[in-house]
């Protein structure tokens, strides 16, 4: 049990005051859930939802031929088992993928002469192989060609309708022009916009604009219908004497002025004086007095617009047309003709403008047909329009589900914005939608409604892996559809089977391209567990269909109020991608529509409940949300009357009864990386950003050391990252060694197919994508009981199941001899000596033997012209032995390549004569160690062609692997056999035998009627136990027979699985064409901390090691302990990352408590005293109960674990207060200032002032000086310019640029400069002569023409300028 006690989360003292309501959701669920929804593997075929892959197939099929005589219909798809498992794919450079089969049905029809009638002639159904589809590993990654990749989720603009204005920038007058845009998921964009004359225009797919009424008329609406849809009308009555009144409509009257006194007809009382506004009170008074009509003057009516045609009652002819302005003459004609009522449009040019009416006036198109033809002309200029083709084009634009898809999200957003109620499965636009879009735009211009904020997270959604791949599949299937249609029309369909029609190559090609080279398919950042988790949780606004760096402005990159709890405001890259790449917050998840949701606790009547609901940014609008740290009394009510809350993106004070929601935790605001920074609340945001980003670059160290001051997130990250081994079932540890753990599962945990044994093979010294070392170490001992979910082995950068990126080091803040000027770091030699910051890096080198035109390359140790000393570490196969220490230039794999027959020089002829033929016709092309690599060979893998002879080394490797597999097989069989024996003994011992059992020699082993004992059972083989029969109890016989048959079945399964693995092992490998053999050699490089390495704390406090000082010269404390790192105090105030100081103080207290516990252990203090001290330090009732249960050895185990310091957890935004830190310091026996007196290590003098000393968690980053330092003697040259290449990877030279040339000129160093620009760079002939001169011991320089000068001349000649070099005398 020691394991579970030492691993108890309670041992980390927690300063959080808010109890946890919900656990943090699994950190990589964003990837796993999306892919699960895409594949729907666990769902039965007939129960699959219309989403993901299923939706793609259903949308593209059925495919019909052009004459509609045959159709290819989709039935279902299924996935087979992957050919190689994850580990094998890593080793062989394969893709981890499953073969996909699609069941399709080909239906052939007989078409009769009568139109519309047809009968089925033939139906054929068949499963067709459809290529491979990559599978996701358990850790949310994909293995493509042997490397682990992550598909980053994309944040893009959600489909739907968006309203915006140009902020007055388009027109010189500064007038604000409004516009609306309908964006579908796929299909044509529709834009409506006003110009500066207030005319409404429409664009389709950003083509030329036309009046919006053209589009509306094409939908089938007439001028009258449109006018009356967008405007309200007023009824005007004409009296006998020609006086006019209008009907009092309360809705239209508000905000208008009375033109004459409004008088109560009964009493004559003036209710509203002329030129006064119709207020609500006035309108109410009018209705009380029964006033239904208001007098209106002729001047007011003149200039109004008729809302309907006005007819002459006698003749029926039209006096005024709809949308015609009433003139004085027309008005007089109306009165004269005796028309008593007519209707005019309500346009006051204040709240209702005449813009739509003006648009109708400039639009000269009368009918729907004309409108359709006009749209056709605009979209297809040059094509002769016909009414039919125009109608088809228009219908296809917005109303055909195959061409236009709003998606469920788009429909949801459209319904939400326009207030319509169209079912979510209607994914195309409706005519009403378009009218409503225009209506909202007109109202927006008239001052009602709001424009949309495109950076609001309700308008941006996430496309995760599943959806990105779904889109790729659709592209592939559409390409395939074209090919199928062509094949159907070219060949006789009735003679074909479905597989003759389907060629899945286009689909496979698209998927392969997506995983291999899409901007969103990225090489996984595998530096440490945190960087893996963060990479999988990343959201990118870049990528296909997203933004580009150059076009993205400040607004898109900025933090938005809706990011709260959804997207981290801190973690984003520095540089050109800032704000475009973000990280999901800790508690956030993505809903089925792709919107980011965050959890809140529900508040009912001022009382906070434990009910948790997830809200997207749109759903949260308008709710008042309290902070997680708002004070609550014991009944769950808010303590204060007014609470600081967030509402619609603003911080407001709200009465407690108005609150509806409350945050679940203070750290729901930030991402995983930021939540690992203790005292984040005391750091400046810029430095917190650097701290988050640099934690991802921390190199896994040789000895992981979890932080003394953490935040409580360390365990969560280690568990979810997948680098640690997590127990699958409850059980007891049977055996443990460095490379595997065997757990016997508890009986109540057996599942139907399981064998009762879990074998965990640990990863040993594997190479990560970033060349860091992945190694797992067991944490459990034989006999330990483990529970499902326990961490049983640590991975890289984890310590006892907690993330451990760096080391806890003793730090002093003081200047020291200028060695910590400008963020430099002075470190003690002690850190190097103890290997505290030593890391292991693994490099992989590959040698390939190919079949060339001149013959086969050969991997061998027999290499011409090399001495014994050079080949001493190669075995007879030519491959270096494991354990060899290699340096740059050493041979890793010996390889010779045949070389073509050439004219031999006299020296070569002599060599031939001495050494025979062999030396001449091959050349040495061995794989050698590149410069800058020095280490130990830790492995070699050999891949040979199928059918090729295996060399000795391959056979040794295969044997070792086979033995490992056999051992697993035997252990599994032994454990399940033992557990079966245990069960059978329970059933049989003590029961009475009904028949006697005899041995092979006739000896009676169990007499009839005897009570069965264990000895009797041991005396013969278990296979015969089913012969035993029990008197008076038939059920026992049945149970025995059943147990034995189950056991045999399980053993058969195990043997089958292992035999299959061995077969795979012995088979040859699939190598690329032309490759005979491939050898991979792995070298482990041990990197100690050295001058030039970059280090950092968690608060953005980074620096470079400037000097490694002997331990005795470091400043030391009064008790003689030297500090380990000295940092510059000037690095703190201007950077404003004070969190590091608080972390130091708390770490100092934690270390002090550890030293006290060590004192107790050293003096063998009574257990009660140790318990008392621990209870005082933890001050936590749960911990008190835990400590009370511990006795003797268990208590000592805990004390030993705490000797290195009592780990603390100071969660983000609810960390330890100043008072808590001071009380911890005094409990540890330190000064509450956190400062101590230091002495100079060199002189022994006391420093003048006290110095802040404490424990800070410090990381070594991946920017190691060994990887950066580089020198070149002779190396490759560029083909065109003949100048040396640049960069370490190309083994390049140092560039001497324009400015450096000026500097040399300024110093008058003419000869040095001539050398730089000619023989040391691109004077080809000159460099050859220089080489010869050096060989002969002469020191002469003959510069010639630089090659780049020739390039310049050729370039001028290509422009048609005849440039020639004239050779001649200087005159």
From Swiss-Prot:
Q: Which GO terms describe its biological process?
A: DNA-templated transcription
According to its UniProt record, which protein family does this protein belong to?
Belongs to the RNA polymerase beta chain family.
Q: Which organism is it from?
A: Geobacter sp. (strain M21)
Q: Which SUPFAM superfamilies match?
A: beta and beta-prime subunits of DNA dependent RNA-polymerase (SSF64484)
Which Pfam families does the record cross-reference, listed alphabetically? RNA_pol_Rpb2_1 (PF04563), RNA_pol_Rpb2_2 (PF04561), RNA_pol_Rpb2_3 (PF04565), RNA_pol_Rpb2_45 (PF10385), RNA_pol_Rpb2_6 (PF00562), RNA_pol_Rpb2_7 (PF04560)
Any idea what this protein is called?
A: DNA-directed RNA polymerase subunit beta
Task: Describe the protein's quaternary organization and the partners it interacts with.
Answer: The RNAP catalytic core consists of 2 alpha, 1 beta, 1 beta' and 1 omega subunit. When a sigma factor is associated with the core the holoenzyme is formed, which can initiate transcription.
Q: Which reaction does it catalyse?
A: RNA(n) + a ribonucleoside 5'-triphosphate = RNA(n+1) + diphosphate
Top EC class for this record = transferase
Superkingdom, taxonomy of origin: Bacteria
Enzyme Commission designation? 2.7.7.6
Per the entry, what this protein does is: DNA-dependent RNA polymerase catalyzes the transcription of DNA into RNA using the four ribonucleoside triphosphates as substrates.
Keywords associated with the record: DNA-directed RNA polymerase, Nucleotidyltransferase, Transcription, Transferase
A GO molecular function held by the record: ribonucleoside binding
An annotated GO cellular component of this protein is:
DNA-directed RNA polymerase complex
């Amino acid at each position: 049990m020691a394991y579970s006690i030492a691993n108890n989360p309670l041992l980390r003292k927690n300063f959080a005051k808010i109890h946890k309501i919900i656990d943090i959701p699994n950190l990589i669920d964003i990837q796993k859930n999306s892919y699960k929804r895409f594949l729907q593997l666990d769902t039965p075929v007939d129960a699959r939802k219309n989403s993901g892959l299923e939706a793609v197939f259903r949308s593209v099929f059925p495919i019909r031929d052009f004459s509609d005589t045959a159709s290819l219909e989709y039935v279902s798809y299924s996935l087979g088992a992957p050919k190689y498992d994850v580990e094998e794919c890593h080793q062989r450079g394969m893709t981890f993928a499953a073969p996909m089969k699609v069941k399709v049905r080909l239906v052939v029809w007989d078409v009769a002469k009568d139109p519309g009638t047809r009968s089925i002639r033939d139906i054929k159904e068949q499963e067709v192989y459809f290529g491979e589809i990559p599978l996701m590993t358990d850790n949310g990654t994909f293995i493509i060609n042997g490397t682990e990749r992550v598909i980053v989720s994309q944040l893009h603009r959600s489909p739907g309708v968006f309203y915006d204005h140009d902020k007055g920038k388009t027109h010189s007058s500064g007038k604000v022009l409004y516009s609306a845009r309908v964006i579908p998921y796929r299909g044509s964009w529709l834009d409506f916009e006003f110009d500066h004359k207030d005319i409404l225009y429409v664009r389709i797919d950003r083509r030329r604009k036309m009046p919006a009424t053209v589009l509306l008329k094409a939908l089938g609406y007439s001028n009258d219908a449109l006018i009356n849809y967008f405007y309200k009308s007023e009824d005007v009555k004409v009296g006998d004497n020609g006086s006019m009144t209008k009907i009092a409509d309360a809705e239209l009257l508000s905000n208008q002025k009375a033109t004459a006194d409004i008088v109560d007809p009964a009493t004559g009382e003036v209710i509203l004086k002329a030129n006064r506004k119709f207020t609500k009170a006035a309108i109410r008074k009018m209705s009380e007095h029964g006033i239904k009509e208001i007098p209106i003057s002729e001047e007011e009516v003149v200039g109004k617009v008729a809302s309907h045609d006005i007819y002459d009652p006698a003749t029926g002819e039209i006096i005024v047309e709809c949308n015609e302005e009433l003139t004085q003459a027309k008005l007089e004609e109306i009165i004269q003709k005796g028309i008593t009522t007519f209707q005019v449009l309500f346009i006051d040019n204040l709240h209702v403008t005449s813009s739509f009416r003006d648009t109708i006036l400039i639009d000269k198109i009368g009918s729907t047909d004309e409108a359709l033809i006009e749209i056709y002309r605009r979209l297809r200029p040059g094509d002769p329009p016909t009414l039919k083709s125009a109608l088809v084009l228009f219908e296809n634009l917005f109303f055909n589900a195959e061409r236009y898809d709003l998606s469920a999200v788009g429909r949801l957003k459209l319904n939400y914005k326009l207030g319509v109620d169209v079912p979510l499965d209607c994914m195309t636009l409706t005519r009403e939608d378009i009218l409503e879009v225009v209506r909202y735009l007109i109202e927006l211009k008239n001052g009602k409604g709001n424009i949309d904020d495109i950076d609001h997270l309700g308008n941006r959604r996430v496309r995760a892996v599943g959806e990105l791949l779904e889109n790729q599949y659709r592209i592939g299937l559409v390409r395939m559809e074209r090919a199928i249609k062509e094949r159907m029309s070219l060949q006789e369909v009735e003679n074909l089977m479905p597989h003759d029609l389907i060629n899945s190559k286009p689909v496979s090609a698209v998927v392969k391209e997506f995983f291999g080279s899409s901007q969103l398919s990225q090489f996984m950042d595998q530096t440490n567990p945190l960087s893996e988790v963060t990479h999988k949780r990343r959201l990118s606004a870049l990528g296909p269909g997203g933004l580009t760096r150059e076009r993205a402005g400040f607004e898109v990159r900025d933090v938005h109020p809706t990011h709260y709890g959804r997207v981290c405001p801190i973690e984003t890259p520095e540089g050109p991608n800032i704000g475009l790449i973000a990280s999901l917050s800790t508690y956030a998840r993505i809903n089925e529509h792709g919107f980011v949701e965050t959890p809140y606790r529900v508040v009912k009547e001022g009382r906070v409940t434990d009910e948790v609901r997830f809200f997207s940014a749109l759903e949260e609008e308008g709710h008042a949300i309290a902070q997680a740290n708002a004070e609550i009394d014991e009944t769950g009510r808010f303590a204060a009357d007014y609470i600081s809350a967030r509402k619609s993106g603003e911080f407001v004070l709200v009465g407690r009864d108005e609150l509806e929601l409350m945050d679940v935790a203070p750290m729901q605001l930030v991402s995983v990386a930021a939540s690992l920074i203790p005292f984040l609340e005391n750091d400046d945001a810029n430095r917190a950003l650097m701290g988050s980003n640099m934690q991802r670059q921390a190199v896994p160290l040789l000895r992981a050391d979890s932080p003394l001051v953490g935040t409580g997130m360390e365990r969560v990250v280690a568990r979810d990252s997948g680098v640690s081994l997590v127990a699958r079932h409850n059980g007891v540890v049977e055996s443990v060694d460095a490379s595997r753990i065997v757990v016997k599962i508890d009986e109540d945990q057996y599942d139907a197919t399981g064998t009762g044994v879990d074998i965990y093979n640990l990863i040993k010294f594997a190479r990560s994508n970033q060349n860091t070392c992945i190694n797992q170490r067991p944490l459990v001992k034989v006999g330990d009981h483990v529970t499902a979910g326990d961490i049983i082995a640590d991975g890289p950068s984890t310590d006892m199941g907690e993330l451990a990126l760096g080391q806890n080091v003793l730090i002093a803040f003081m200047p020291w001899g200028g060695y910590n000027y400008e963020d430099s770091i002075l470190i003690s030699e002690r850190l190097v000596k103890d290997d505290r910051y030593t890391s292991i890096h693994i490099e992989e080198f590959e040698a390939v033997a190919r079949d060339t035109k001149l013959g086969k390359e050969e991997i061998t140790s027999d290499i011409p012209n090399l001495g014994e000393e050079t080949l001493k570490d190669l075995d007879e196969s030519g491959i270096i032995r494991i354990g060899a220490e290699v340096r740059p230039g050493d041979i890793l794999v010996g390889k010779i390549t045949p070389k073509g027959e050439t004219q031999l020089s006299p020296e070569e002829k002599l060599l031939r004569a001495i050494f025979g033929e062999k030396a001449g016709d091959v050349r040495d092309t061995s794989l050698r160690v590149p410069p800058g690599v020095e280490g130990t060979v830790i492995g070699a893998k050999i891949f040979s062609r199928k059918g090729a002879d295996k060399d000795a080394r391959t056979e040794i490797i295969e044997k070792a692997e086979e033995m490992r597999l056999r051992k697993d097989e035997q252990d599994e069989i032994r454990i399940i056999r033992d557990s079966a024996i245990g069960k059978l003994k329970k059933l049989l011992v003590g029961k009475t035998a009904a028949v006697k059992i005899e041995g092979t020699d006739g000896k009676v082993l169990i007499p009839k009627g005897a009570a069965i004992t264990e000895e009797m059972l041991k005396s013969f083989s278990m296979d015969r136990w089913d012969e035993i029969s029990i008197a008076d109890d038939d059920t026992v016989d049945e149970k025995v027979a059943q147990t034995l048959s189950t056991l045999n079945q399980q053993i058969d399964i195990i043997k089958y699985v292992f035999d299959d693995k061995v077969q795979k092992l012995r088979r040859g490998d699939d190598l690329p064409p032309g490759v005979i053999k491939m050898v991979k050699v792995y070298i482990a490089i041990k990197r100690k901390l050295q001058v030039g390495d970059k280090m950092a704390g968690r608060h953005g406090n980074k620096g470079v090691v400037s000097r490694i000082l002997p331990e005795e010269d470091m400043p030391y404390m009064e008790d003689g302990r030297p500090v380990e790192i000295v940092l510059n105090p000037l690095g703190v105030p201007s950077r404003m990352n004070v969190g590091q100081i608080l972390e130091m103080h708390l770490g100092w207290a934690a270390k002090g408590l550890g030293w006290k516990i060590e004192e107790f252990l050293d003096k063998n203090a009574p257990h009660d005293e140790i318990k008392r001290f621990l209870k005082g330090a933890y001050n936590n009732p749960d911990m008190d109960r835990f400590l009370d249960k511990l006795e003797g050895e268990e208590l000592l185990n805990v004390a030993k674990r705490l000797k290195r310091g009592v780990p603390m957890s100071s969660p983000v935004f609810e960390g330890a207060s100043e008072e808590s830190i001071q009380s911890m310091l005094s409990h540890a026996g330190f000064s509450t200032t956190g400062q101590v007196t230091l002495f100079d290590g060199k002189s022994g003098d006391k420093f003048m002032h006290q110095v802040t000393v404490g424990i800070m968690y410090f990381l070594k980053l991946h920017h190691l000086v060994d990887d950066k330092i580089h020198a070149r003697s002779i190396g490759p040259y560029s083909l065109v310019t003949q100048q040396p290449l640049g960069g370490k990877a190309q083994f390049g030279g140092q560039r001497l640029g324009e400015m450096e040339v000026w500097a040399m000129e300024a110093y008058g160093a003419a000869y040095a400069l001539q050398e730089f620009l000619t023989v040391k760079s691109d004077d080809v002939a000159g460099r050859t002569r220089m080489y010869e001169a050096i060989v002969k011991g002469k020191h002469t320089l003959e510069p010639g023409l630089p090659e780049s000068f020739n390039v310049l001349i050729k370039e001028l000649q290509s422009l048609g300028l005849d440039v020639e070099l004239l050779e001649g005398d200087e005159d």
